[in-house]
């Protein structure tokens, strides 16, 4: 077959000025939706990343039971305290990113009776002979993690009675104390080197965690974040302001927002905002609101 040889062809594009314009119409709503979707996706990714880091940290404690079973076993105070203390340290690090260690001068006690608890506050702080005491309301945490409806708790709306309840509870929690430094009181072994930590992480790479288990970790993290913010008030403003914050969360929010608003963005509590409204049918169309305050404003 005979080949035909062609001469090389060179094309040239010339751009000439012209008054004609190419018009295209854009829908701004579409851009807004894409931007909102991107922001929501980014926030969801940050929430999932924070929760994944927390679950990986708890995995390094080498617990012998699942998270819910640990809190159901009232006799296993060692693991309960280890989980709460490790979670407090995790939240402390997210609240103060440049701080790597949490206080080791805290004593812990688990409470079981109604006289030593405050509804809605499963973790309380008080002072006992100059030492900081953390009281863990184990039954309430179990109900929250298992998502049970608590029909037996007595919530008193009157302010005067609530002040008495808070005072009695904080005093009752001082009667029993257990230190993390007591003789024979050993926390669960944690990794000390990168190789030990990597071994713990490798154990997470070949299985899936159910949504129910993940929700339990998320609930516990939110519980401890809420308690940590009260702890911040206790350490910086004293026991009196701390007790007031237990009764009135508007004071609780205002004190924190005044000086630590930037740090709140690292906590998962800053990702939620909603208001629960209840209509009062006895009065003429009035509505009482129970507001869950948001720090991300």
Curated annotation (Swiss-Prot):
GO terms for biological process, alphabetical: symbiont-mediated perturbation of host cell cycle progression
DNA damage keyword on record: no
UniProt keyword annotation of Zinc present: no
Primary location recorded for the protein, binned into one broad class: virion
InterPro entries given in the database record: Baculo_ODV-E27
Superkingdom, taxonomy of origin: Viruses
Segments traversing the membrane: none
A Pfam family hit: Baculo_ODV-E27
Subcellular location: Virion membrane
Keyword field: Host-virus interaction, Membrane, Modulation of host cell cycle by viral cyclin-like protein, Modulation of host cell cycle by virus, Viral envelope protein, Virion
One GO CC annotation: viral envelope
Family: Belongs to the baculoviridae E27 family.
Chain's role: Acts as a cyclin-like protein and plays a role in the modulation of host cell cycle. May promote G2/S arrest by interacting with host mus209/PCNA, cdc2 and cdk6. The cell cycle arrest is characterized by an intact nuclear envelope, concomitant with sustained activity of host cdc2. However, viral DNA replication still occurs in the arrested cells.
Known partners and oligomeric status: Interacts with host mus209/PCNA, cdc2 and cdk6.
Protein name, entry field: Occlusion-derived virus envelope protein E27
Annotated organism of origin: Orgyia pseudotsugata multicapsid polyhedrosis virus
